[in-house]
Amino acid sequence: MARVLNIEIPNNKKARISLTYIFGIGPTIAKQILADANVDGEKRVKELTEEELTRIRDEAKKYTTEGDLKREINLNIKRLMEIKSYRVIRHRKDTCKRSTKKNARTRKGPKKDNRWKER
């Protein structure tokens, strides 16, 4: 298995899919990393040369991933808790977080589906 950012990525998968195994790198960023490194995303990781892997590692270092990203997310949540933001209050009350209206199915009863009844 190849190592990128101290994470072992699967050898038998395509490079663009393997990079998504790293926390903080999704499909879009994986494609961007491969494009910047001039590496074909359809190649399997085991087919990549050491030079290509080095270029991928260098490009991936530019992004916030794994522990740093998790730490940043936790700090953002703590900051919201300290200032007692509306979102945190809604989280604590276990209600809708983004001020959308709740589904009133409990009051209305189960959804009636008339599509399958004979006409």
Swiss-Prot record:
One of its GO terms (biological process) is translation. Pfam families: Ribosomal_S13 (PF00416). Transmembrane segments: none annotated. Residues 92-119 are annotated as: Disordered. GO terms for molecular function: rRNA binding; structural constituent of ribosome; tRNA binding. InterPro entries: Rbsml_uS13_C, Ribosomal_uS13, Ribosomal_uS13-like_H2TH. GO terms for cellular component: cytosol; small ribosomal subunit. It comes from the Bacteria. HAMAP family: Ribosomal_uS13 (MF_01315). Part of the 30S ribosomal subunit. Forms a loose heterodimer with protein S19. Forms two bridges to the 50S subunit in the 70S ribosome. This is Small ribosomal subunit protein uS13. The gene is rpsM.
